[in-house]
Amino acid sequence: MQTYPTGVAAKATGTPLTTLQRYLQRSHITLQPCDVPSRGCGENRGYSQRRIIQIALTTELARLGIGPSRAAKAAFEFSDKGNTGRPVGELYPLGQTLLVGLPDGKSVVINIPPDKSISDVLSNDSAAFICDCGYVVAKVLSNLSKS
């Protein structure tokens, strides 16, 4: 699996390096088996595409006023967990893929089919925040293709 150095990850996500380092130091973002940790002998840390997307979603949610701990946990629901019809770290093939933060602190990834509205899918549930994963993923993939 391809990984990217810290500078590329920061640039692709629009996350300042100091903010990215803070996410890691405070364990908001933790490296997973698909990432490459630094061995401390001058080797760079390697971020997988999934981790870069988690960082980008975390940064986007932080811009919306969500705290980094909750933002990173919510982003992990998209980047590292799949749903029926959606592989891990990928968008639903049709419609919109939304990351929804619920008032109880949990987060879910939902699909809004092309013929439905968000109110049809959320029904009586209320949301603390909603983030369009498609927008964030497209931005990250475009930036990574330029690196």
Regions found by a protein language model. Give the residues of each.
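Polyanion-binding surface elements
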Residues: 1-26
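Short alpha-helical DNA-recognition segment
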Residues: 22-36
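A short, Lys/Arg-enriched interface patch at domain edges and termini
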Residues: 49-80
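Low-complexity intrinsically disordered segments
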Residues: 76, 81-147
